[in-house]
Regions:
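Intrinsically disordered, low-complexity boundary segments flanking structured domains
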Residues: 9-11, 51-55, 181-182, 191-193
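Short amphipathic alpha-helical "recognition" segments used for binding
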Residues: 7-8, 52, 284-285, 292
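Sec-dependent N-terminal signal peptides
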Residues: 2-13
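Penicillin-recognizing serine hydrolase domain
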Residues: 19-20, 24, 92, 116-291
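Hydrophobic alpha-helical segments, especially transmembrane helices
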Residues: 4-5, 49, 224
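Active-site-adjacent loops and short helices of periplasmic peptidoglycan-processing enzymes
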Residues: 16-154, 158-167
Length: 292
């Protein structure tokens, strides 16, 4: 029976073997600390930072609306959405759902809202990466569900720096919780980053990411100057969401950033539903069934 479990696990794609990160001073454009900064790894939903940039730069209708349809379903990992299907929504609400709660369906719908096919939108994402000098970066979908979406911490520094120029990204990065308006529906969504969700740090750029192949990722730039410098922490393949939060907090504090009102990280019961990543209970149930 144990061999059957091992066989099932062998079918699951593996993820990168080591954490890589950069602590970056965005005021003086210099690396403060790093480990394997050019290591290329899957980035998961960190992808959505590029999706947001490409949408904002190519959408010509600031009042656009679009409905989530079956075309926006996740056929890679099987994730779901809290948002209603076939209900026209303001694009700004979809952008909010994507950046605050990392909603995959919203990411797919936004690529259509920009007046392009999904393939055309992804081509724009790769074109933008080349323009920014992100030569180790490749995109295959707009949500980050594909493990073929790859980048490095140093490439993501360039994306983070570019994102600083977008007022919409700056605002949405720091929302701890929000109600998404979809027709008559109002859907509560919380930030996937515990540091923002629990108001431990304010963010000016903030995007988490997780799939099994990537580990837990984060692009984070602190909103408030740290000893007169704007400091960011970009890390890939953290071992857990909790470790990602503590690692980022420790690095920020090491370089002069202070937690809001001296707040610390505490576990909160039931908050797992607000974390990024997809539901792996199906795999766990299958393993239990085979091994039982």
């Amino acid at each position: 029976m144990f061999k059957k479990v091992l066989f099932i696990l062998s079918l699951c794609p593996s993820f990168a073997v080591a954490q890589s990160y950069v602590v970056y001073d965005f005021t003086h454009n210099r690396v403060l600390e790093s480990h394997a900064p050019d290591s290329v790894q899957p980035i998961a939903s960190v992808t959505k930072l590029m999706t947001a940039n490409v949408f904002l730069e190519n959408n010509t209708n600031p009042n656009c609306t679009i409905a989530i349809t079956s075309d926006d379903r996740d056929y890679i990992k099987g994730t779901s959405t809290k948002l209603p299907m076939n209900v026209p929504m303001a694009c700004r609400e979809l952008l909010k759902a994507m950046l605050v709660h990392s909603d995959n369906y919203a990411a797919h719908a936004l690529s259509r809202a920009a007046g392009m096919s999904r393939i055309q939108f992804i081509n724009k994402m790769n074109e933008k990466a080349r323009q920014l000098g992100m030569y180790s970066t490749r995109f295959h979908d707009s949500s980050g569900l594909s493990s073929s979406n790859i980048s490095s911490p140093m490439d993501l520094v360039k994306l983070a720096k570019h994102s600083l120029n977008k007022p919409e990204i700056r605002q949405l990065s720091n929302i701890s919780a929000t109600n998404i308006q979809a027709g008559r529906h109002s859907v509560l969504m919380k930030n996937t980053n515990k540091l923002v969700r629990d108001e431990i740090f304010d963010a000016v750029v903030n995007k988490t990411g997780y799939i099994r192949e990537s580990g837990y990722n984060l692009v984070f730039i602190n909103k408030h100057p740290c000893k007169s410098s704007t400091i960011g922490v970009i890390s890939l393949n953290n071992s857990s969401s909790a470790y990602r939060s503590s690692f980022t907090k420790n690095k920020l504090e090491k370089y002069g950033c202070t937690a809001l009102n001296g707040r610390t990280i505490h576990d909160v019961e039931g908050e797992a539903q607000y974390e990024d990543g997809y539901d792996e209970e199906g795999l766990n149930d299958l393993i239990k069934k085979v091994s039982g």
